[in-house]
């Protein structure tokens, strides 16, 4: 099945056109190539009626600029088809020249100005800068839908947590590749935003780089698998949480009763939270993130066979080794709203590393992950 075909299968499962985030595990792994591939082909697989429904496009953060702001390397531009709807900040829209026509304003602002809804009127590159908070990213997707977009693609990154959230999109395509090994280009969280994958990389990055293609591929596979594991947590089976908008952190007891943790935020109160946790609790429900502080407090306790329920996989902010240790103890991470990782795209090239054989990289990722893997350049 092709990559667009996987999206159409997701549509059939949901009964509606899926909103999808394209998320890169690092710089230069082919995220924009994946985005352009989908923008070009979404109307070509399946029913021809799809091509009559405008695609919506936004970014959690900024993308589509000519040169990377950190590395100064040229970046692939974003080419949405004419008729598409784009949510982007004012100065980014101005830099897109005559490609965009204003449709409507939004209540959201970024450092590049007010985010507006624009229609693509010329086949030229556009620059996209959208809001970065979870609520505003979700609101932007809703506004694109309201103005006629049938499906919204979100240009994201793994260190922009909102881009992969189940509150924003109904599926994620993860772009990965050999640039994960590049100094600077592949180290996530360099801005200090220690999110899901940057925690994973922080735990895995210290290993010396392998000397052979096979060894380097194995390192990329391990890092990618860590990201996928932390993002795609299984759904919580606790029926008491089904459909709940329960805002509190607390304990789920046998029989489904819920006891809230009254002190509030758990970010710096891991030991206090674990001491409070009732002995009979079946699950610890976290309103926000599972931090390293809380995870270490759980490991230091004698708790076993306890479910740890977070909103979704973007709320896992502990180190990858800590994540694995929790599972080994029987402290199993679950999500109230699971993230559906639909596919992996693989890039065998990197700015600062020799290219590895595409077939070898794709095969290694395919063997390690229960997901379809594509090299969209070698096998479009």
Model regions: which residues?
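N-terminal phosphate/diphosphate-binding loop that engages ATP/GTP or pyrophosphate donors
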Residues: 38-120, 331, 367
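Hydrophobic/aromatic beta-strand patches that form the interior of the parallel beta-sheet core
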Residues: 20, 56-58, 170-173, 342-345, ...
